[in-house]
Amino acid sequence: MKIKKLFPFAASAFFCSLSLSANVLYWVDATSYFNADASGKIDGTSIWNIARDFSSTEKSEYSDNYNWATGYTVKEVSAQDSVSGQTTVYYVPVYEYASTVTAPDENTDVYFKCDDFSNGSDSIGYRYRIAGSISLGADTTVKSINIQRTDDNWLMFRTNGHDLTILEDVVYNSYAVALIGSSSSTNIKVGGNVRVLGSGGLSRYNAFRLGGDGVGSIKIGGGIIFEKQTRMQLTTAGNASVFDNPQSVVSGIADFSGYAARLDLGRRSGAIEQFYSFGGLSGSNSDAVISTDAETDSNGLVSTLVLANSSDAVFAGKITNPTTAEDNASTILTNTVNVVMNGSAAQTLSGDNDFRGYVTVQSGTLLLRTASGASHGKLTLNGGKFGAIGNASFASAEWNGGSIGFFNTDDAIALMTPETVTINGEFLKAGSSKIAVDFNGVDTYDLIDNGQWYDLIEAASLSGFSDEADDDFIAVNLSDGYAEFQWVDGDFGKVLQVSFSSVPEPAAFAALFGLLALFAAARKRF
């Protein structure tokens, strides 16, 4: 007879006891070495769908265990495979309970922790991890939630329309899906950070799904911090709203650090555009991704990323939308990601961005690079500043206010060549004032009086503009000389160009001379 031992992933010493303070509770496995057959079902019901009340101190159906423990020991249990005859030794928990069994409250650190245990087995009906979905029966507040290696079964935390408040951090460190939230009537609040350590994989089967298939709102007081290459889905299904009243708010930064992690905004299809606000995006890995869920059922998702930066941030990954379904490669997806800049600082998106949705700048500074061959939807400038990195391309554009920046990067300054903006359709000037062209204080000494014209914007057609470009554009933050603008015919439309000189062009010079004359006359009267 063969004997095989399955060792725990995080090695506690054999028969070690892990005891917790009165303010720390473990969710208890309901089906340890037990009543499930090889299908993983009890009375025909999958063991992760046996609803267990999160706030109950009582024993759950099919279990001799209470829901919450203050600690556990680990012991060996042998089980024999009926077909092969092989005996396997599993490491399983033996839980410890307080004299008065309790349930979590606002002072409790909640642990879904299975990293000391062995994996289950289909062949002999042994399963243990997070059997039975956690179910809320009322609005609930806890101090923190820690999810650690709940890998054998998905963790299904069903909120059933009740609100869940976590005063401090949420930590996800697991291989399998962990889902929190199950109703659009639920509001989830996290006072601290969401730390995502995850599995090291990017499959939808390895994702942390905060919001489940869509809750009413998600508010995170801190940031989302990726500490490994992993995947997270942030999902709301709230009522119709606008960018400055988003269904999801992450007050801090979504920090990808150096990891090729993935953040999905939205899961499962919904007709209502959902707004996901962040205090900024940060990350140095060009393979990091912000997108939507990519399952067949998500087709048609419209998710809008709102950037509410209060400090400058740079994200080198890409913002994209999936084009084919992960669960059926023949299904073409029409999901859309939009971007709104509504902050007080600068957000740089320097990756291969190819999202198909619109871009709106309300306030703050947005610097955007478009992937080669890609184009976004409509660019709308209502305020703040927009600038390209290399090139930014759009289906159309409308200017109501704000400035357009050039010489936005060290590369452009080193080459002394401004970035370009491509508008494949109409460029509409709806605002009445001049469009400020912000040159970011670049030293144009070598460009002055060199007789060269530099392309800035190319548009298929123009609307609301004067015949003379200098009537519609004005240079700001130019360290030396003067800028002159002109429209010329391009390959597919009109091209806005700029040239730099040591003296203003005649019309501007005449206007300046006239102002000086008026000033002199006014002084003479006094």
Set out the residue ranges of the language-model regions.
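Extracellular repeat-rich scaffold modules on cell surfaces
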Residues: 27-47, 158-250, 286-380, 428-432, ...
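A short, hydrophobic C-terminal helix/tail in secreted or cell-surface proteins
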Residues: 505-522
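Extracellular beta-strand/loop-rich repeat segments of large surface/secreted proteins
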Residues: 303-304, 311, 338-339, 368-453
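Glycine-centered positions in the ABC transporter ATPase nucleotide-binding domain
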Residues: 261, 345, 364-366, 384, ...
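Bacterial N-terminal signal peptides
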Residues: 9-17, 517
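Bacterial N-terminal signal peptides that target proteins for export
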Residues: 1-10, 506-507
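Solvent-exposed adhesion/ligand-recognition segments of exported proteins
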Residues: 21-172, 308, 442-502
